[in-house]
C-alpha cells in the first residue's frame, strides 16, 4: 500500500477527482456506480466506483500543494493518469460571483511545492483536453463558467488579510497586479498539481 493514501494496486481508477476536504468524498462518490470506500488515512480519504463503465476514484488531499502533490504522486504509482482538482476558490476578477464555476487554464506559481519539480520559468498550465471537457460540462449543466488563470498561494490568511502582514505592501501590490492581468480567482493547489502532473506525464 502507498505510504500516505494507504491504497494498493488495483484499488483506484485511471481518472481521479481531487477535493481538498475528506468530508466531500462521500458526496462525490455517491455519483459513482457501486462506490466503495478504499482507504482513509490522515487527510486522504479514497472511494472508487465506476462511471459509464469506467473505473474512477475520488481522493481528498487536504489543503495546499504539499499534501496534494503527495496524493498525485502515490495515485500515479497505482496507475492513475488523469486528475481533476475540485474545490473552493476566492474570486479576484470582479465578474466572478459567488456560486460561479472557474475552470483554470493555468496558475500563477505563488507557492513553493512546484519549485521541487520545475524551475520558476516553467509555466503551470492545465491540460488542454481536460480543461475543454470541464468547461463544456460546466456550461452544459447551466453554471456561469469562467476560464482563465488563477493565483495559487501557500498562505490562506496571509492572502485574505494582507494588511495584517509585515509584508503587506508587497502582497497588496501583487494583488493589484493579478486584478489588472485578469486573473480569475485565488486558491492553493492548482500550480503544484499542474506542474507535478507534467513532471509525471499525467493530465490535470
Pin down the residues of each PLM region.
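Expand to "…catalyze enediolate/carbanion chemistry for C-C bond making/breaking, isomerization
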Residues: 77, 167, 199
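Generic secondary-structure signature for well-ordered alpha-helical cores
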Residues: 30-37, 106, 135-144, 155, ...
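Short secondary-structure transition/capping segments
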Residues: 95-98, 158-160, 198-199
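Glycine-rich beta-alpha junction loops
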Residues: 22, 90, 151-157, 192, ...
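Metabolite-binding pocket within alpha/beta catalytic cores that recognizes anionic/polar moieties
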Residues: 1-133
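Active-site rim beta-loop-alpha module in soluble metabolic enzymes
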Residues: 125-182
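A C-terminal functional module that forms or caps the active site or interfaces directly
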Residues: 174-204
